[in-house]
Amino acid sequence: MQRAGATTPSTSPIAQVRTPAPLARNNIVTYLATQFDSLDVRGISDVDSLVLACVSYYQLPDVATAARTPEGMPIVDLYRADWFEGLTLGLWDPEGLVRLLGSIVASPRFRTIRLCDYVSETDFGSEQQFSACTLRLPTGDVYVSFRGTANSIVGWKEDFNMAFETRVPSQSRAVRYLERAASFAEGRVYVGGHSKGGNLAAYAAAMCDQATHARIAAAFSHDGPGFTRETLSSPSWKESAGLIHKTVPRSSLIGMLFEQQEDFSTVESTSVGVLQHDPFSWIVDGVEFRRADGLSGGADFLDR
């Protein structure tokens, strides 16, 4: 983990071309500011999942030792001005992520969450970059959040390895992490992620052991890359297909990578092209994403 104040040039293709997305009139931040139902009244939706998937992007400091245990720490304890720079250093939208954290800790739906079992690992030898956390919800359920692609050569190289290998190191690690998280959970298990994190969430939900699989209520992939033909034709995947909910923006490029795709729904975005990968650009109407009729021409071409 990098210390606050360190500077590392971003190697992410998206980060290099990114300009701040036009703020959606209604996005996940305004959703948190306007929707106050408890999770007992209205359960986890794909909009909620995108919020919780983004939590795994925060890079916790070494002093946050409680967050690395099964008991965890209150998520409100993350909201410290002296931590903001380190939490978001090198990420795609530091200001947006700080704003999101403030909205989470103010939200009646999520402000009592505990952040548990945070891990962040990089292995240059196996070309693995992996980070995840478990969010203990006020209902007694948990949401396992897998981080998306980090702005590093290792992170992007592993993403491209997914196009050619049926099981890359971070996918194997995600399965083990999910099984451990489920063993500590009292209630149902939700799992999700954005970008590569969505791929890891779907893969782990499909390939975990039967005891864990029986606990999973839903798995969410938010513009996560797809899978090889071998993975999608496996018995484990076919058994799990009904649990997996994939959302992609209309001009999705990242989520349409790889030879075949699982089923998905399409959402509207305020950005264009590859910038639609930014979750803050996804439009929310009320408590749901604004659905699009289908993919744009470029994204549809990638899906063929």
Where are these regions (language model features)?
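Catalytic cysteine-centered active loop of the rhodanese-like fold, especially the PTP/DSP P-loop
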Residues: 188-190, 203
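Alpha/beta hydrolase fold serine-hydrolase catalytic domain that processes acyl esters and thioesters
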Residues: 3, 12-47, 52-66, 70-112, ...
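Short glycine-enriched nucleophile-adjacent loop
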Residues: 201-210
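Gly/Ala-rich beta-loop-alpha elbow adjacent to hydrolase catalytic centers
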Residues: 193-197, 201
